[in-house]
Amino acid sequence: MPEDGAGDGGEVPALIPDGEPLREEQRPLKQSLGSSLCRESHWKCLLLTLLIHACGAVVAWCRLATVPRLVLGPEAALARGAGGPPPTYPASPCSDGYLYIPLAFVSLLYLLYLAECWHCHVRSCQAPRTDAHTVLALIRRLQQAPPCVWWKATSYHYVRRTRQITRYRNGDAYTTTQVYHERADSRTARGEFDYSAHGVRDVSKELVGLAEHAATRLRFTKCFSFGSAEAEASYLTQRARFFSANEGLDDYLEAREGMHLKDVDFRESLMVFADPRSPPWYARAWVFWLVSAATLSWPLRVVAAYGTAHVHYQVEKLFGASSPPPGAVPSGPPLSRVATVDFTELEWHICSNRQLVPSYSEAVVMGAGSGAYLRGCQRCRRSVSSNSLPPARPSGPRLPFSRSRLSLGAGGRATPGVFRSLSGGPLGRRGEDTEPLESPPCYEDALYFPVLIVHGDSGCQGDGQGAL
């Protein structure tokens, strides 16, 4: 809540609890006339109003205007025989029943106009009306509410069913069998982001100046962000683990995710008045219907939109803003990267927690002895990027994981595989001293045996190396 300052007499936002820095202020903005027209044009009401007034102008023209009409009969024949002008008389241009056509259009358009006004009134009443103090208390509860980032996975399939329906053709009823497919949910799983090891903090803005406007339309949204790379990696890892664990359980998978605030009633739209018991004249119901009956609803809506201030308040939660508590325990094994789900071998190492995959910059500056801890292990020799080159070129530069791929061999053979360079150049060309590459396996072998590295339960204990 803002309070008066002692020196400059301005407003200073309140301090966030726990000694955090001051929040950034946010004020409602009053739009110009052109901006209010672009924001809420109410084109249906404007179009119906113009059509009603056009039909009314046609009716008035038919009743008030006169046109000369020729006189038929003996008098006209005598006038033509005498060589004078033909006799005429003034008459209405919409005689002979043509006046009822614009009247019918006016009646129909007026009914449509009243229906559109009723829909507009219902939409305006859907937003709850409250005062500024209640809104500030609600914002304080939103800022203090703990977030919950959730995931939902629904496994389902379609069941073929039949039903009997009756159809009519040429007055005869006949029964036919209709085949349709009905969705059947087989399993539903829910998960939440565990941020206890990273902490969370509210970084929403401080809303001030609500009492300065007679009417303010407030729109709420919520979002979250990350203050550290560790928190973002933990979120992506938990999310990928959740959806990968629920993938393939049925024919189809419906994935949903979102965020809600616990123990608080979140409303997306509010109408705030300085005094809800006496709102401005353009926001009263009897004024709206009185003006609408006179087909002046569109000008009233323009005045109301111009006199209403707007503010979009976003509740934002920041994960990873504080250091983890002393007793915090990670929710699972530390998976380094989730962008390697398409690489079978790297994903196997990550899920098994056997090795940490370096980033591209780390792999470029990796030294010659970075893979020495695995050279003694015959079963892990193929998982090190320093062994990705053919043995005939031991002193050549090394390829990072992101620039090489494994040439798949037979599933049960112990012959070390060879990495092929995708970057071209000397590393991608086969020299005379390069060993011949193994032929790739067939599609079925690669599909059923995607992982060529087999580790025992004891890791590398048998080869004299510790577990990674």
From Swiss-Prot:
Q: Looking at the UniProt record for this protein, which Gene Ontology cellular component terms does it annotate, in alphabetical order?
A: axon; dendrite; endoplasmic reticulum; endoplasmic reticulum membrane; membrane
The listed locations are:
Endoplasmic reticulum membrane; Cell projection, Axon; Cell projection, Dendrite
> What UniProt keywords apply to this chain's record, in alphabetical order?
Cell projection, Disease variant, Dystonia, Endoplasmic reticulum, Membrane, Transmembrane, Transmembrane helix
Could you say what the effect of mutating S297T is?
A: In EKD3; uncertain significance
| Consequence of changing P68L | In EKD3; uncertain significance
Q: What is the effect of changing F319L?
A: In EKD3; uncertain significance
Region of interest: Disordered: 1-21, 384-438
Q: How does it sit in the membrane?
A: Multi-pass membrane protein
Where are the bilayer-spanning segments? 45-65, 98-118
The annotated consequence of C351R reads: In EKD3; uncertain significance
What outcome follows a substitution of E362G?
In EKD3; uncertain significance
Signal peptide location: none
Q: Outcome of F193S?
A: In EKD3; uncertain significance
User: Does the record bear Endoplasmic reticulum in its keywords?
Assistant: yes
* Effect of mutating P358L: In EKD3; uncertain significance
Which disorder is it associated with? Answer: Episodic kinesigenic dyskinesia 3: A form of paroxysmal kinesigenic dyskinesia, a neurologic condition characterized by recurrent and brief attacks of abnormal involuntary movements. These attacks can involve dystonic postures, chorea, or athetosis. EKD3 is an autosomal dominant form with incomplete penetrance and onset in late childhood or early adolescence. Symptoms are usually triggered by sudden movement or stress, and resolve in most patients in their early twenties or later.
Protein family according to the UniProt entry = Belongs to the TMEM151 family.
Protein name per its UniProtKB record: Transmembrane protein 151A
The taxonomy runs: Eukaryota, Metazoa, Chordata, Craniata, Vertebrata
Q: Which gene encodes it?
A: TMEM151A
